[in-house]
């Protein structure tokens, strides 16, 4: 067996290898990913967002961003690796192979006279009579004397030159990669050490795995608890009004688990008084309503009051303990709302469609939470059917400012956005009473607000017309434009303390029956992924139609160009319903901005199934009547009035009618639609 020092060195080399194998490639991957991040300003530059500090890269924040658990772990492992390399190198110098020629400073095969000369020279330097240093004495006895003896003795020299060792042929040595203290252990402490190794290497990882699995089993892939999804599914109803969505949202298990402290009672009472007008309490029975409100589960009371404090701007009065709960509540809100939308859109029997009304209500709630705008601001007022909510998301805007500009016949948010810049600046400074800096902030935010345009087409691949039972494919190009030229951007949300990306929900729905036939989430943040997805979808579609390689290449290039210009391809399939003309509406709703949603009306004519039962025999039956579709921006009172936003009173429909015959299932919605998200204008 090898010496204990060699075994210790082997053990350290083993540990170093185990650390380096995963650490080196992972570090390279992290560095490459960091190098590819583009330093581009995509957030709002108004004074409100600047003061919020979300995007301010101070030294402390940069250190905090770097000082994550993963980064600190990587740094610590690299320090351990460097220490191990240094220590192994030092140990390997101490544990040296016996080399007599090297010890005497000679080349292999030196003559006997050279050996004697070198020995005399080293003796003068290291001999105890010449050098009293104990280390010199030790080196002289253990190395120099032995080396001289090995090279001057004929037998020893011959053995060394032949076998590499003065004692002749040596047996093979094997080392064990274990530390020295384990090899020199007696039987009494061996059992304790064995138990320690078993506990550290087997039991501890097993316990960590059990704890992790027990906790992770409570959550879905989107880090939402399974209990939350079950609760949302149970309370989700097809007739759920937007004003009642809040009651379902706050029942999340994550919120129910938040602590309720006795010290919070008095601050919550004061908060209740401040936000009471937003709680939908019946003023005729106010005492009964208040008593009923406080009889709810304490966590529900606390969450609703904290959300209303955020929507009404009363969060500044929260105590430190409530402020911590408030921030945690807002941190969880985006992904909980995202899951709540998915629950509303979940296909249900008998037709396998989702529900439109609750889905719109959840997205409206998301808009209000991100922009910190009261839900009551969606009520129609002063002839403005969409309410004042879109205005209140602008910096320095209050109800008073909105009333002032309303006197100048500004009837909608879209009219305000479409005004010339100079005229709008005059309106803000001279009528609304804003300063020049305030007017500039408003312009910066207006430049960030997205304008959405949707081109949508429904067809059966490779066939003319749509017959009942066909698999219908929806192709939709969703195009985004901003006045500042950005495609990917973070919304203006100075009151929301966390980063929030824009997401858009494209819903193809039958508003009259409250059914969502198709839904998909659209993001403009990742252009590379969008190009890959669009290219793959176009290629598969063209190949199914039997297009040539050249035609496929041209179609892919056109799709890539559209993506780079700010469009996203959305595709989905659904089964054609029964024969007849179906009045559909495609909604494109943003979860972060108020007032930038669009909807497109289209008619889908479904023909009766041919007698042959296959699409291939349609042509033999005779020509099929060309299906007509009308692209409309008209009154939809019969289709959608029952599903208007609960925040709005009786709203007048002032849309102009524009009809034109185009292919079946095709519609185009220009940007800057005059609709509010969830109510008919």
UniProtKB/Swiss-Prot annotation:
Sugar-modified residues: 7
Pfam families listed in its UniProt record: DnaJ (PF00226), Sec63 (PF02889)
Membrane topology according to the record: Multi-pass membrane protein
Residues covered by the SEC63 domain: 222-602
Annotated keywords: Chaperone, Endoplasmic reticulum, Glycoprotein, Membrane, Protein transport, Transmembrane, Transmembrane helix, Transport
Major localization class: endoplasmic reticulum
Chain segments annotated as transmembrane: 9-29, 68-88, 191-211
BP term (GO), one: SRP-dependent cotranslational protein targeting to membrane
Function: May be required for integral membrane and secreted preprotein translocation across the endoplasmic reticulum membrane.
Entry protein name: DnaJ protein ERDJ2
Encoding gene per record: ERDJ2
């Amino acid at each position: 067996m090898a010496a204990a020092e060699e075994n210790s060195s082997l053990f350290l080399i083993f540990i170093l290898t185990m650390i380096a194998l995963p650490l080196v490639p992972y570090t390279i991957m992290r560095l490459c990913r960091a190098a590819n991040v583009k330093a581009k300003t995509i957030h709002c530059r108004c004074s409100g967002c600047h003061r919020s500090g979300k995007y301010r890269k101070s030294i402390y924040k940069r250190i905090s961003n770097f000082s994550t658990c993963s980064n600190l772990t990587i740094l610590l492992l690299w320090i351990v690796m460097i220490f191990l390399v240094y220590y192994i190198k030092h140990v390997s110098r101490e544990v040296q192979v016996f080399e007599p020629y090297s010890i005497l400073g000679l080349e292999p095969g030196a003559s006997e006279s050279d050996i004697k000369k070198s020995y005399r020279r080293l003796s003068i330097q290291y001999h105890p009579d010449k050098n009293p240093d104990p280390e010199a004495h030790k080196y002289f006895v253990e190395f120099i004397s032995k080396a001289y003896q090995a090279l001057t003795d004929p037998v020893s020299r011959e053995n060394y030159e032949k076998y590499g060792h003065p004692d002749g042929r040596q047996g093979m040595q094997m080392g064990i990669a274990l530390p020295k203290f384990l090899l020199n252990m007696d039987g009494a402490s061996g059992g304790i050490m064995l138990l320690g190794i078993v506990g550290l290497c087997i039991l501890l990882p097993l316990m960590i795995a059990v704890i992790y699995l027990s906790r992770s089993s409570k959550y879905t892939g989107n880090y939402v608890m399974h209990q939350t999804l079950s609760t949302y599914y149970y309370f989700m109803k097809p007739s759920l009004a937007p004003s009642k969505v809040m009651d379902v949202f706050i029942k999340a298990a994550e919120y129910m688990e938040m602590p309720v402290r006795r010290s919070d009672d008095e601050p919550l009472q004061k908060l209740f008084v401040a936000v009471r007008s937003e709680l939908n309490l019946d003023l005729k029975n106010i005492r009964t309503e208040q008593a009923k409100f406080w009889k709810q589960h304490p966590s529900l009371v606390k969450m609703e009051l904290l959300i209303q404090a955020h929507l009404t701007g009363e969060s500044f009065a929260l105590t430190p303990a409530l402020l911590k709960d408030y921030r945690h509540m807002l941190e969880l809100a985006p992904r909980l709302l995202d899951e709540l939308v998915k629950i509303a859109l979940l296909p249900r029997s008998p037709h396998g469609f989702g529900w439109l009304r609750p889905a719109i209500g959840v997205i409206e709630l998301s808009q209000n939470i991100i922009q910190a705008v009261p839900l009551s601001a969606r009520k129609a007022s002063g002839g403005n059917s969409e309410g004042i909510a879109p205005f209140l998301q602008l910096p320095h805007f209050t109800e008073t400012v909105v009333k002032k500009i309303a006197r100048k016949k500004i009837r909608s948010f879209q009219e305000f956005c479409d005004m010339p810049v100079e005229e709008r600046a005059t309106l803000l400074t001279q009528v609304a009473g804003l300063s020049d800096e305030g007017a500039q902030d408003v312009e910066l935010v207006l430049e960030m607000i997205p304008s959405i345009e949707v081109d949508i087409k429904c067809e059966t691949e490779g066939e003319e017309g749509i017959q009942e039972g066909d698999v219908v494919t929806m192709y939709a190009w969703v195009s985004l434009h901003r006045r500042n030229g950005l495609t990917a951007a973070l919304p203006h949300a100075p009151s929301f303390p966390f980063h929030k990306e824009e997401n858009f929900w494209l819903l193809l729905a039958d508003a009259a029956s409250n059914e969502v036939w198709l839904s998909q989430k659209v993001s403009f943040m990742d252009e590379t992924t969008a190009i890959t997805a669009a290219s793959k979808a176009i290629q598969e579609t063209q190949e199914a139609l039997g297009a040539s390689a050249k035609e496929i290449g041209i179609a892919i290039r056109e799709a890539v160009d559209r993506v780079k210009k700010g469009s996203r391809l959305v595709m989905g399939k659904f089964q054609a319903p029964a024969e007849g003309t179906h009045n559909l509406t495609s909604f494109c709703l943003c979860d972060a901005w108020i007032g930038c949603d669009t909807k497109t009306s289209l008619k889908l004519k479904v023909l009766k199934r041919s007698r042959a039962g296959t699409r291939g025999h349609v042509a033999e039956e005779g020509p099929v009547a060309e299906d007509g579709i009308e692209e409309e921006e008209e009154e939809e009172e019969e289709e959608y009035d029952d599903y208007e936003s609960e925040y709005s009173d009786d709203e007048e429909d002032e849309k102009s009618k524009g009809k034109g015959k185009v292919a079946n299932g095709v519609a185009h919605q220009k940007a800057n639609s005059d609709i509010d998200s969830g109510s008919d204008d």
